[in-house]
Amino acid sequence: MPPKKGGDGIKPPPIIGRFGTSLKIGIVGLPNVGKSTFFNVLTNSQASAENFPFCTIDPNESRVPVPDERFDSLCQYHKPASKIPAFLNVVDIAGLVKGAHNGQGLGNAFLSHISACDGIFHLTRAFEDDDITHVEGSVDPIRDIEIIHEELQLKDEEMIGPIIDKLEKVAVRGGDKKLKPEYDIMCKVKSWVIDQKKPVRFYHDWNDKEIEVLNKHLFLTSKPMVYLVNLSEKDYIRKKNKWLIKIKEWVDKYDPGALVIPFSGALELKLQELSAEERQKYLEANMTQSALPKIIKAGFAALQLEYFFTAGPEEVRAWTIRKGTKAPQAAGKIHTDFEKGFIMAEVMKYEDFKEEGSENAVKAAGKYRQQGRNYIVEDGDIIFFKFNTPQQPKKK
């Protein structure tokens, strides 16, 4: 049976941002809002978490496994010798302060660290604690969110001027017709960011050519955000805090579609110090759960990443790809020969595998698909690739 032409004619929307799968999400916020504590509990590491601004100077970076019941289930079924989940690369960036775009605090260095990331965990503080100073003198997460947004916005505005000046010199005054379209696009970006004071990512109708230009410059306001609200343990457990509704309203108005996830750094730290059995008892007694799995998954999705599985008795592995990746390019993640000699992808949906109970049962039910080179891989696909081995050049 020839492979089906799954995905023919379906073109995924272009993505603003760096191309690739080794993408990073940075933890961004004002000093002393709980960034390093969050990084530590997320990664089980011991980054400095002292109570003073700029205790994090060089960014700390770590890989965090992405929790997935599908992966766990496949491992339980196959009992493989090797288990490799997907990972999220997380960076702890020092606290920004008002005036960072002008070099206040360690502003320029911090903004360059954000520039090196592909998405942002925007962490804000909504807990009171007299022992933990706030750089602005009081707890007001809306004000804090606006400070961060303004600093990123002002840095982009600062970047746009010289880019347009350079293009104008070559494309307009110099008559370089090839660069004229890029100049026109940057004028549109200027109108949106500088004149209308809106982040790059808020405009949802950038076309392919415009996104190509945006991706040359990687503006800070083009990066997707997940808003993390750090609560006291008490507020998190009772699911009440005076700021939560206000934060959600602000995000819905100024960053529509972005997620707002409450968590408690204090609770997560406490859970980390308990044994697995004690942790389970504590969570059940308080009728709550850790927010970390939800946060990790949200960060991974914000970077437009997903993964497919290869599964067998030797190895169960999650292979990270960008959304919209076609089967040959997904095969190339395993080995370049798989892409070069691609014949077809034999695909099972995880849900079908779970429902039927085995690969043979999936085949018997007619749910095992052969897909061609235009098939767009979907998150959670279980795939076996068929390919021709490239011919080795004959020795003379």
Swiss-Prot record:
Would you tell me the Gene Ontology cellular component terms?
cytoplasm; nucleolus
Domain TGS: where? Answer: 304-387
Q: Which cofactor does it need?
A: Mg(2+)
Which compartment or compartments is the protein found in? Cytoplasm; Nucleus; Nucleus, Nucleolus
For the keyword Zinc, the answer is no
Q: What is its main location?
A: cytoplasm
State where ATP binds. Answer: N32, V33, G34, K35, S36, T37, L231
**Presence of the UniProt keyword Transmembrane in the record:** no
| Quaternary structure and interacting proteins, as annotated | Monomer.
Q: What is this protein called?
A: Obg-like ATPase 1
List the lineage, top down.
Eukaryota, Metazoa, Chordata, Craniata, Vertebrata
The encoding gene:
OLA1
